[in-house]
Structures are given as structure tokens and as C-alpha cells.
Design a protein with these regions (language model features):
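Prokaryote-biased recognition of long, low-complexity C-terminal linker/tail segments
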Residues: 53-66, 75-98, 104, 109, ...
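Conserved short secondary-structure elements within globular domains
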Residues: 89-99, 152-157, 287-292
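A carboxyl-terminal module marker
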Residues: 160-342
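Long mid-to-C-terminal scaffolding/interaction modules that assemble large complexes
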Residues: 91, 109, 113-114, 118-124, ...
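Amphipathic alpha-helical segments
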Residues: 13-26, 137-152, 273-280
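Class II aminoacyl-tRNA synthetase-like tRNA-binding/catalytic domains
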Residues: 1-113, 119, 181-195, 202-204, ...
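Short histidine-centered catalytic/ligand-binding loop motif
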Residues: 2-7, 115-137, 259-267, 318
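Beta-rich nucleic-acid/ligand-interaction surfaces
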Residues: 32-58, 153-178, 293-299
Length: 342
């Protein structure tokens, strides 16, 4: 559906607002890419950005593998190497990314990211009297502090040191918004090995990433991530091109329906796989999957009880409809996950 390419959609509005910031503040225009194929190789998704072989994100429980060598990209960083090799030095990449995850109001198996990347030549940092890493880090922080002000207005900010495989040093920018601290950007100075591999051994660079839904939910007061996928005119008609931060007005609040499922788990069971089964059957009607009880008996067998919340954004669900979905969930959970229903 490429929601980020729709100028009147909250994600498209946010993307264009970020474009506006970079176009206004940088004479060296950033090349923009928002239509790159989400099918990438394992090498592109992990190896090219130095993700360790034993990193949890490589797991079949966390990533959508099409085959052993191909995945649906987990992040827009998967295109970093190819863009560098093609001669790009300033670029923004926006696209849909895919991760196996929990089910709740802020998580969805597909969401949207934007990555920014900027390369510097030695003359730039040598003229400043700083070393390359310090120069890139200072420029990065100035850039993202300006972007945060552009999107959120005058807000209190703080920098937090963190870890990413592909940057060193690595940071997160947090803003104080609506009476709490919120992480808005993950970023850092690009690992030199990435630049060396892509024909830029004498350069330094910075990179940042952001989740469009995460920011748009706050800016537009959108309470549930599933709403971004709604074609209901009561949702889509509330937003206009160029109108950043228009507050969403809930058009209805249909009641949820709760169903519990209990089963004995095996050693290979993961909650992400359970959520994948539920989404595969209920789709957007699955609002949340929550572990509400677990215990281990005297024989060492462990039982989990999950509560599934079903709710439509657009209509009331019938008891027969929910009972049918729950029956299918029970069947598929038992057959696909090889657990024993209680």
C-alpha cells in the first residue's frame, strides 16, 4: 500500500515534513529514496551493516525469511551499502519494514522507517580542528536537534549513549513531550568498516533512523497503530497534505471481545510465533495478545494462558464471528506450534 508515499496520509505528511527540513537546511541536497524493494538478501539486511552472526534479530522468530538467503527487510539500513557503492553521499531512505513482534496498540508486523546518511570528506573536519569522529558526531547532533524542533516545536532534549552494531559512538535523542521522555531518533557515527567496504576508506559519516508510526502516533494523537492501515473515510478525511500535527478525532469506539487460550508449551515455543498465527487468522481484528498466567507443574510441564483482544476499528463484531476466529486460532496454534491445548 506504500502508506508513506500518500501525501494526505499521516505517514506521508510526516515524511514530507522531514524532507522539508533537510531541503531547507542543507545546500547539499539529500537524495531521497522511498520505493526500494523490501525483499533483500541476508547479506544486505545483516552482514552489510555488521550485525553479528549470533544477534537475536537474525532469528526466524524475529525476521521474515522468504528463503534461507532472502528476507523482508527489518530496517531501511539494508540499502545503505548499495547506495554508497552507487555514489550517494547524502541520502534519506523511507520504506516499509517487517519484524515478527508482539500484538498491541503500538506494534504491527509491518511498519515504516526512515534512515538518513551523510558522508564527510577530510577537508571538512580538518578545517574545523576536530578529528573526524568528533566532527561527525557534533554535526549529527546539531542536525537531529534541529529536526526535533521542526517536528515538535521547542522541547527539552537529552542525549543517551547506546549501542548499535553499525555505529560507534551510538546515541538516542529523547525529547520531553506530554510530560514524559520519549526516544525519537537512534543514530551514531558510522562504523569505519562499512565505509571501507563501500569504497570510502578515507571518509567519515553519520546515520540516523526513525520510526514513522512511532512519531506520527504522538504528533497526530493516533491511539492504535492499526488505524494507519484503515481506508475508512472517517479516518482518511481528517488529514490533508502539508498539515503536520492535526489531531485525530476518534470516530467511534467499538467494544473489544476477549477470548482466552491455554496450552502446554514446548521448548521451541515463542510468543512471536503465537502472534504470527493469530494475525494470520484474525488480521487487523487482533488488537492485543497478552500473557495473563503461567505455571509449571510437578512434572516440569509449563502452561501459558493468553488473552486475545479482538476489536474492529470500523464496526461491532458478532459473537459468532469471534467464536469462529477463536476456534480457528486454537486449531492452528495446536497444529503449527505443536503445543497441547488445555
Amino acid at each position: 500500500m506504500q502508506l508513506h508515499r500518500r501525501d494526505q496520509h499521516p505517514l506521508g505528511i510526516l515524511k514530507n515534513a522531514i524532507y522539508e527540513y533537510f531541503d531547507t537546511n542543507y545546500s547539499d541536497k539529500f537524495n531521497k529514496f522511498d520505493d526500494l524493494c523490501p525483499l533483500v538478501s541476508v547479506k544486505q539486511n545483516f552482514d552489510d551493516v555488521l550485525v553479528p552472526e549470533d544477534h537475536v534479530s537474525r532469528s526466524y522468530n524475529d525476521t521474515y525469511y522468504v528463503d534461507p538467503q532472502t528476507v523482508l527487510r527489518c530496517h531501511t539500513s539494508a540499502h545503505q551499502a548499495e547506495l554508497l557503492k552507487n555514489g550517494n553521499t547524502h541520502f534519506l531512505v523511507t520504506g516499509d519494514v517487517y519484524r515478527r513482534d508482539s500484538i498491541d496498540s503500538t506494534h504491527y508486523p509491518v511498519f515504516h522507517q526512515m534512515e538518513g546518511f551523510r558522508v564527510f570528506v577530510p577537508d571538512e573536519w580538518e578545517a574545523s580542528g576536530m578529528d573526524g569522529t568528533s566532527f561527525a558526531a557534533a554535526d549529527l547532533k546539531k542536525c537531529l536537534e534541529g529536526l526535533a524542533c521542526h517536528l515538535f516545536g521547542a522541547v527539552e532534549m537529552r542525549w543517551v549513549d547506546t549501542y548499535f552494531p553499525f555505529t560507534n559512538p551510538s546515541f538516542e535523542l529523547e525529547i520531553y513531550f506530554k510530560e514524559k521522555w520519549m526516544e525519537v531518533f537512534g543514530c551514531g557515527v558510522t562504523e569505519q568498516e562499512i565505509l571501507k567496504r563501500n569504497g570510502k576508506p578515507n571518509n567519515v559519516a553519520w546515520a540516523f533512523g526513525l520510526g514513522l508510526e512511532r512519531l506520527a502516533m504522538v504528533l497526530f494523537d493516533i491511539p492504535d497503530i492499526r488505524l494507519f492501515w484503515s481506508n475508512d473515510e472517517r479516518f482518511t478525511s481528517q488529514f490533508s497534505k502539508g498539515q503536520l500535527g492535526v489531531k485525530f478525532k476518534p470516530f467511534s469506539k467499538f467494544p473489544p471481545c476477549y477470548k482466552d487460550i491455554s496450552f502446554w508449551i514446548n521448548e521451541s515455543f515463542t510468543e512471536n510465533n503465537l502472534c504470527e498465527v493469530v494475525i494470520g487468522i484474525a488480521g487487523d481484528l487482533a488488537e492485543e495478545v497478552q500473557l495473563i498466567d503461567n505455571f509449571t507443574n510437578k512434572k516440569g510441564m509449563t502452561s501459558h494462558c493468553y488473552r486475545i483482544a479482538y476489536r474492529s476499528m470500523e464496526r461491532s463484531l458478532t459473537d459468532d464471528e469471534i467464536n469462529d476466529l477463536q476456534w480457528k486460532v486454537r486449531e492452528q496454534v495446536q497444529s503449527k506450534l505443536e503445543v497441547v491445548i488445555r
